[in-house]
A protein has these predicted regions:
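N-terminal, polar/Ser/Thr-rich
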Residues: 21-53, 173, 498-500, 504
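Short, hydrophobic/aromatic-enriched beta-strand segments in well-ordered soluble domains
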Residues: 56-58, 75, 148-162, 211-219, ...
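A surface-exposed beta-strand-loop module
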Residues: 61, 98-174, 250-251, 578-590
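Hydrophobic helix-coil surface modules that form long, contiguous segments used
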Residues: 186-193, 201-357, 386, 398
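Beta-strand-rich binding/interaction modules
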Residues: 224-225, 499, 512-576, 581-591
Length: 591
């Protein structure tokens, strides 16, 4: 007989207190219409003035049930001008991004960014438009009817700003051009209407489409980015296969690079004359490209390549099949930033592996699922942080991560714990541009967003959570899901009601806090009283450990769940009546 000396481990999701004493069938609810925008652009870059001339043809299909009388374009480079909204916000917020600070306010005319629109036509007819900050507003000559496709033709000029945030020229590592948010980009229109947000420095949301881009630039420059190069034997620079003969087609000292990118919502590229270009072909035929400055941190970049391959293999198996044929890791920008088929990452860092894994995993959430990051950044940053953390643990466990590259960091939940016990936390439902503090935004989007997914494994069981991750990807890829969409997937997989989970964890800042109020022995029976201290209810697992080392699980589901998660260990398990959220205490007995 076991001795009645035991420890009680009270589990309530993410907070734990210890006291002694490829394509599946699409469901109807994911048949959400999507707008489509096919881009054809030709760009001529002047590396002396840092300006480029561009023409854009955009075929826009209105798959909505609505008649559209206007359209909006994002002109992101206009944010890099003194007195822009990004500049004012950065100089007025209590905790400015150190990369930005007051730097925009000090830019000269040669250092600012801009996008000047010379003409805009709808089906060959000039359209009136007005540029307001980083948004172009166009009143259409003829409304776009549901199901109709129209063509917009645009002539424009851009000036690449001195690198401050994400995009720009001549970053601190000497990369000449990080060309992100560089072209006039049509705003998204969805079931919530237009999303023509000003560019304040936060997140993005785009229209699915096919891109065909031709970039003319001085012949010594090497380009990496979104899309598949169509003319590698006219370009070389490492794009040719072994044994192939390259015959560069140079005109006026420039090469014209021809890229296509199918079914993406953005196109990014970077260019530098000193890029080394390495390639790794995975067993499934996918190609990983690596662009970095020659002679800098070569050991780390070489070590990164097989680890990136292992990361993609794990992600394909556990989070969904990556749908494109390549991915590029490119030295550029000001940290790490995700784009379809690519990431821009600073190369002189100890966290090269960790940031690469994180940014690559964005291609599952930002790139393929494509939620509205401005409204729900946690569905991208948080889920990506969760997934990249799992990959890091996997690489450590199979011995793949023994390298000079660092082991990626501490669980993202640690930052959430710090902010949850402060007075600066804001709900996850806050628009990304409207957080009062940069720190509150990043902790919510990355930390609490990762906890959302990790903690869900406690609520419904890790097996159901992992199955739901795959079903979420396969059901909602290329469809811009929202918080209810992802929750419904996990409800179907688990058979449990989960609306309460978002109502508390996403739309409020109520905390989870449970404790053991009392333990009283009465003969051969021990009565345990639990108390709900915090304002967010959770199901509770109590693990009783006896003196002889054996364990027993006592489980109390929430009544709101309308069911229970399955047992997850081989230890004996007692399922008690559910706990109504209105009741501050709960008593059960251990025989």
């Amino acid at each position: 007989m076991r001795k009645r000396i035991f420890a009680i481990l009270l589990l309530t999701g993410w907070v734990t207190t210890t006291l002694v004493g490829q394509e599946q069938a699409t469901r109807k609810d994911s048949d959400r219409w999507q707008q489509y925008a096919n881009y054809y652009m030709e760009i001529d870059m002047n590396v002396e003035t840092n300006r480029f001339q561009g023409v854009q043809k955009l075929e826009y299909t209105n798959n909505s049930p609505d008649e559209l009388n206007q359209v909006f374009y994002h002109l992101y480079f206009n944010a890099f001008q003194p007195e822009s909204m990004m500049d004012v916000r950065s100089r007025s917020i209590q905790d400015p991004d150190r990369r930005v600070g007051d730097r925009i306010s000090k830019l000269s005319n040669e250092e600012i960014g801009y996008q000047k629109i010379f003409s805009l036509k709808q089906d060959g007819e000039q359209v009136e438009f007005e540029v307001v900050g980083t948004v172009l507003e166009a009143k259409l000559n003829e409304p776009i009817q549901p199901g109709e496709t129209v063509t917009f033709d645009m002539e424009f000029e851009g000036q690449v700003p001195l690198q401050i945030r994400r995009s720009g020229r001549d970053n601190r590592e000497g990369i000449r051009y990080t060309m992100t948010q560089w072209y006039p980009k049509l705003a998204e229109y969805d079931y919530q209407g237009w999303h023509a947000d000003e560019y304040i420095g936060r997140e993005f949301y785009g229209v699915w489409g096919d891109y065909e881009i031709k970039i003319s630039i001085d012949e010594e420059y090497v380009i990496g980015g979104t899309g598949y190069l169509q003319n590698p034997l006219e370009i070389g620079h490492g794009y040719e296969n072994p044994g192939q003969t390259v015959k560069k087609k140079v005109e006026n000292g420039k090469l014209t690079w021809h890229f296509v990118a199918p079914n993406v919502h953005d196109f990014a590229w970077a260019a530098d004359p000193d890029y080394a270009h390495d390639k790794l072909t995975m067993d499934n035929g996918m190609v990983l490209h690596f662009f970095h400055q020659k002679g800098q941190n070569e050991e780390n970049w070489k070590a990164l390549m097989p680890l990136a391959e292992r990361a993609f293999e794990y992600a394909n198996e556990n989070f969904g099949q990556y749908p494109y044929k390549q991915f590029s890791v490119i030295q550029g920008g000001d940290g790490g930033m995700e784009y379809p088929m690519s990431t821009m990452i600073t190369g002189n860092r100890g966290s090269l592996l960790g940031v690469t894994i994180h940014e690559a995993l964005h291609d599952w959430y930002h790139g393929v699922l494509g939620n509205n990051e401005a409204l729900t950044p946690w569905m991208d940053e948080g889920f990506t942080s969760y997934a990249s953390g799992r990959i890091s643990r996997h690489l450590r466990s199979d011995g793949s991560e023994e390298t000079t590259i660092e082991n990626i960091g501490t669980p993202a939940g640690g930052s959430y714990l710090r902010i949850a016990t402060s007075d600066i936390e804001e709900p996850l439902s806050t628009h990304s541009d409207h957080y009062n503090l940069n720190g509150a935004y990043s902790t919510a989007a990355y930390g609490k967003g990762a906890v959302w997914m990790s903690q869900l494994g406690y609520v419904i069981g890790e097996e159901a959570r992992d199955k739901g991750l795959l079903e979420y990807f396969n059901t909602w890829k290329f469809k811009h899901p929202n918080p209810n969409d992802v929750l419904r997937v996990f409800e179907r997989v688990s058979g449990l009601e989960l609306d309460w989970y978002n109502e508390y964890f996403v739309y409020t800042t109520k905390n989870i806090d449970y404790g053991v109020q009392n333990v009283v022995g009465e003969g051969k029976q021990t009565n345990v009283t639990l108390e709900k201290i915090g304002l967010m209810p959770m199901p509770v697992d109590v693990v009783v450990t006896y003196k002889d080392g054996t364990k027993e699980v006592h489980y109390m589901a929430l009544r709101m769940m309308r069911g229970e998660k399955p047992a997850e260990t081989n230890d004996p398990r007692v399922v008690h009546p559910d706990w109504p959220w209105t009741n501050p205490t709960y008593e059960f007995s251990i025989d």
